[in-house]
């Protein structure tokens, strides 16, 4: 009988302990985590509304061009593009036309080649110089050496547009995506996404379509 009573007491004590332990652990966890900042998941690239990442890259004229060095401008049209991609080539004349029209209004084009020439030799710096001369580029054509700028922006394609607005000497993202809705033919374009966003900014209006899907070639990154 004495043994039986001891067994019952042991079972009751174990039951109480098992019920109270999670609660005590939860209380302890709350004490540990209370007041501690949560660590968000690592963000990849920029979103609309973010402050743009500054950069300084070599232009095809061998001069360094920095975003923060631009003067008397209202913003900038940063376009990640390249030599070899058929999508990028299809848009070259349209990019030239956009630069001609909007540079005078305060929004110059800045083209950046994000590709690793070891993976795509046609996108080497020397071939960038040749292409810029052949096409008569009126805008800087910069080389993202070391591939540090394109991931900071979150570019994934060529071409990939990031429209920046300048406020108090800082740049903020107002549009991300495609130039328009038809890479094959400029004559068949129905929606000029980039120009619509530019016109809205110039009229001090909100950009209604702030993001679209960039259509183009994947950026060629180093496999080493």
Positions of PLM-derived features:
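Positively charged n-region of N-terminal signal peptides that target proteins for export
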Residues: 1-5
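C-terminal motif of bacterial Sec signal peptides marking the signal peptidase cleavage site
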Residues: 15-18
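Short, low-complexity, disordered segments immediately C-terminal to signal peptides
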Residues: 20-36
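N-terminal "domain-start" segment that seeds a small globular fold
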Residues: 32-68
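Short active-site neighborhood of thiol/selenol oxidoreductases, capturing the structured segment around
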Residues: 68-89, 198
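Structural microenvironment flanking redox-active thiols in thiol-disulfide oxidoreductases
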Residues: 89-134, 145-152
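Short, internal strand/loop/helix patches
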Residues: 129-170
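Thiol-/selenol-based redox modules, centered on thioredoxin-like
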Residues: 163-224
